[in-house]
């Protein structure tokens, strides 16, 4: 028996959030690092791969003895949930059991009704070169506080592995 478990939720931005898009070319005076946006609506969005990668990184920091440069060296429970490109003893690559969908904004009307016209803001920052003490100003676009994004995660459960399923769901829930 094989089944899929759907995990749904809402991610609320508590402070300005930047998940960057391409900044291959920036005109003078333009934002140096724009936010990734939904091509249909031009609203900020969160790629599922970004959340999945962040989840894996945080869990790897918690469960690995040392931070691994290569994700194939993660502990077995993380590789079982998120996959590994390393072949096992049978020559099989371990596929991810988790699918994280792209997250789109779900409260645009609520934000507009509060009199807020834009869903992003531009934050001016400085990075200072430690050796020369020269400031390098830059502009970062961020999704504003209060935006909400729908989360949809699918976990692929395999029959006969009930103990693993419980452990995997607990791991994802962290």
Regions found by a protein language model. Name each.
Residues 1-128, 132-174:
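RNA-binding basic/glycine-rich loop and surface signature characteristic of RAMP-family CRISPR effectors
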């Amino acid at each position: 028996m094989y089944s899929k478990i759907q995990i749904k939720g809402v991610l609320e931005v508590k402070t300005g959030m930047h998940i960057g898009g391409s900044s291959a070319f920036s005109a003078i005076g333009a934002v140096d690092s724009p936010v990734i946006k939904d091509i249909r609506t031009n609203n900020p969005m969160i790629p599922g791969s970004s959340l999945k990668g962040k989840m894996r990184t945080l869990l790897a920091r918690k469960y690995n003895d040392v931070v691994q440069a290569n994700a194939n060296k993660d502990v077995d429970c993380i590789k079982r949930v998120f996959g590994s490109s390393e072949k096992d003893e049978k020559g099989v690559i371990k596929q991810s059991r988790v699918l994280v969908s792209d997250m789109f904004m779900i409260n645009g009307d609520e934000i507009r009704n509060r009199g807020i016209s834009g869903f992003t803001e531009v934050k001016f920052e400085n990075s200072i070169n430690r050796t020369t003490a020269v400031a390098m100003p830059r502009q970062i676009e961020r999704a504003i506080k209060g935006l909400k994004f729908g989360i949809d995660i699918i976990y692929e459960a395999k029959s006969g592995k009930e103990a693993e399923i419980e452990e995997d769901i607990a791991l994802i829930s962290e």
